[in-house]
Amino acid sequence: MSTDKITFLLNWQPTPYHIPIFLAQTKGYFKEQGLDIAILEPTNPSDVTELIGSGKVDMGLKAMIHTLAAKARGFPVTSVASLLDEPFTGVLYLKGSGITEDFQSLKGKKIGYVGEFGKIQIDELTKHYGMKPEDYTAVRCGMNVAKYIIEDKIDAGIGIECMQQVELEEYLAKQGRPASDAKMLRIDKLACLGCCCFCTVLYICNDEFLKKNPEKVRKFLKAIKKATDYVLADPVKAWKEYIDFKPQLNNDLSYKQYQRCYAYFSSSLYNVHRDWKKVTGYGKRLAILPPDYVSNYTNEYLSWPEPEEVSDPLEAQRLMAIHQEKCRQEGTFKRLALPA
């Protein structure tokens, strides 16, 4: 880029889980590191990796599966840190829609997806469960999966527990229906992945920018770590500061989404090696990565100790599901303490 300003592209319009990035800006943490950051919003979320990979933008956010696929398609990007770790992701639907926990109940239904790789996931899952392409209708929804379910444009769609599922729960509450009528068929279980890490939201860099500016990236991540620590230490105070800067998020839905995102925030920012191995394997299974593909992530720009990975990731997922259900019922800010 021809400017000293670092450009950073969000993966979507500002959401509750973008709070560390904006607070690093408003609280002066970037400035403390001698950085000038321009935070940008995409018109189309599908453009993010292409814009960063082509060098039009320096850094940004994207899910793990998209980060892997971007480099495989000739857009050189690398993950340097994690923002949101393993949010539960799956096929969302409403009770009474004719869909059940039996995946084959999706036969004859309209299934929504965000972008290209969501369609690939649906096709692979339906094939795995003995369905043909003509047995369902795939509908590209962008980030409007919950909206399309509510408007009956689709019967089900791929979404995240702490975002689109909360949106469905809020809709149900206004209809006088229990929030538990919002259901999810988790993709990690359907696809036998053992983790929801393919939708881990990452801080990514253009490779050339990373090569030329290693110290700037280190300083950027120091500022992000300080902001993340601030959010985790006092989430209510942090939220008040965030909505003062982003008043469009000052509503019940956004606050509840923030509560549900809280347990997923990566406190260390470290890329989890085991998750990358699993998702790289999943990408090869989906045929979006070549057989010899090498994962494009690094932790070398994080200047604090790396935590130990959990010894039993399946048990961690089970406990997180219980934790998130309790959060839904009680509306509290709590982190899940997992054994190493």
From Swiss-Prot:
GO terms for molecular function: 4-amino-5-hydroxymethyl-2-methylpyrimidine phosphate synthase activity from histidine and PLP; metal ion binding. Gene3D superfamilies: Periplasmic binding protein-like II. Pyridoxal 5'-phosphate binds at G115, E116, F117, G118. A motif (CCCFC) lies at residues 195-199. It catalyses: N(6)-(pyridoxal phosphate)-L-lysyl-[4-amino-5-hydroxymethyl-2-methylpyrimidine phosphate synthase] + L-histidyl-[4-amino-5-hydroxymethyl-2-methylpyrimidine phosphate synthase] + 2 Fe(3+) + 4 H2O = L-lysyl-[4-amino-5-hydroxymethyl-2-methylpyrimidine phosphate synthase] + (2S)-2-amino-5-hydroxy-4-oxopentanoyl-[4-amino-5-hydroxymethyl-2-methylpyrimidine phosphate synthase] + 4-amino-2-methyl-5-(phosphooxymethyl)pyrimidine + 3-oxopropanoate + 2 Fe(2+) + 2 H(+). Its EC number is 2.-.-.-. GO terms for biological process: thiamine biosynthetic process; thiamine diphosphate biosynthetic process. It is an enzyme of class 2 (transferase). The modification N6-(pyridoxal phosphate)lysine is found at K62. Its cofactor is Fe cation. It comes from the Eukaryota. The active site is at H66. InterPro entries: NMT1/THI5, SsuA/THI5. Pathway: Cofactor biosynthesis; thiamine diphosphate biosynthesis. Keywords: Iron, Metal-binding, Pyridoxal phosphate, Thiamine biosynthesis, Transferase. CDD domains: PBP2_THI5. Homodimer. Present with 752 molecules/cell in log phase SD medium. Belongs to the NMT1/THI5 family. Responsible for the formation of the pyrimidine heterocycle in the thiamine biosynthesis pathway. Catalyzes the formation of hydroxymethylpyrimidine phosphate (HMP-P) from histidine and pyridoxal phosphate (PLP). The protein uses PLP and the active site histidine to form HMP-P, generating an inactive enzyme. The enzyme can only undergo a single turnover, which suggests it is a suicide enzyme. This is 4-amino-5-hydroxymethyl-2-methylpyrimidine phosphate synthase THI11.
